[in-house]
Amino acid sequence: MKIALGIEYNGTHYFGWQRQANVTSVQEKLESAVSFVANEFCQIYCAGRTDSGVHATGQVVHFDTKAIRSEKAWTFGLNANLPADIAVRWAKVVSEDFHARFSATARRYRYLIYNHPLRSALFPTGVTHHHVALDHHLMHQAGQYLLGEHDFSSFRAAQCQSNTPWRNIHHLHVFRQANYIIVDIQANAFVHHMVRNIVGSLLEIGSGKQPVEWMDWLLTQKDRTLAAPTAKPDGLYLVEVKYPNHFNLPKNPLGPLFLGEPKIDFHHD
């Protein structure tokens, strides 16, 4: 039997998704809980291997098991055996041809920036604090240069193991809610550190250090050393993974926290 799970987690205290020796990972905690509930070892496969300190509200995973449990039993049983910063939002029996990573058609991330001169005591984690005033309109305009299929070498980490730097960005929206700026980006897939590297350069543009057209220039140069430093992991969330409709997977409300779909006409920003 193959089971898919919708997972959310606060990645602050984890060295990323992937199991590694001598450090704590989300995969390790989840595999331990699933294996306990299933009464057999179950290996977990995820849609997106998030880095150290990165969070998720819409991670999707799957595992194979001989255990017969109801979807409700999987959800409540796993949550009873997971730490407080990892939670299962849904469980579903899926067909044998489903794979959390290879069946996915798109991944969507949100980067949450607390844009205020003073830091917040209520959100010491889960957001990236940027004290310099940012113009989210300029950031949004710059992001439109990245839409479509491109070579994203300028936003690719040096240690990236992908065979190709080509990716297809479906949308990139930047919007503000009070003191929070949200960068919402969806693509077929991402190279290593791609979202955080893009956000790093958007911050330069939003703070007035670089013009909007700089983003277009960076893309054409295909040189990571020319772009801005990588943005911190604190504000990054994997919020949605998309699959073909025939898998009929449940959908979590888009997060994090209070964030839903923005009611903004981006064409007139």
Curated annotation (Swiss-Prot):
Q: Which keywords accompany this UniProt record?
A: Isomerase, tRNA processing
Q: What does this protein do?
A: Formation of pseudouridine at positions 38, 39 and 40 in the anticodon stem and loop of transfer RNAs.
Q: Which InterPro entries match?
A: PsdUridine_synth_cat_dom_sf (IPR020103), PsdUridine_synth_TruA (IPR001406), PsdUridine_synth_TruA_a/b_dom (IPR020097), PsdUridine_synth_TruA_C (IPR020095), TruA/RsuA/RluB/E/F_N (IPR020094)
- UniProt GO molecular function: RNA binding; tRNA pseudouridine(38-40) synthase activity
Q: How does it assemble?
A: Homodimer.
Q: Which residues cross the membrane?
A: none
**PANTHER family linked to this entry:** PSEUDOURIDYLATE SYNTHASE (PTHR11142), TRNA PSEUDOURIDINE SYNTHASE-LIKE 1 (PTHR11142:SF0)
User: What EC number(s) does its UniProt record assign?
Assistant: 5.4.99.12
Please name the GO terms of the biological process aspect recorded for this protein, alphabetically: tRNA pseudouridine synthesis
- Tell me one Pfam family matched here: PseudoU_synth_1
Entry's family note: Belongs to the tRNA pseudouridine synthase TruA family.
- Which superkingdom does the taxonomy of this entry point to? Bacteria
Q: Which residues hold substrate?
A: Y109
Positions of the catalytic residues: D51
NCBIfam families from the xrefs? hisT_truA
The reaction(s) annotated as catalysed by this protein in its Swiss-Prot or TrEMBL entry are: uridine(38/39/40) in tRNA = pseudouridine(38/39/40) in tRNA
Specify the enzyme's EC class, one word.
Answer: isomerase
Q: Please state what the protein is called.
A: tRNA pseudouridine synthase A
HAMAP family reported in the protein's UniProt record: TruA
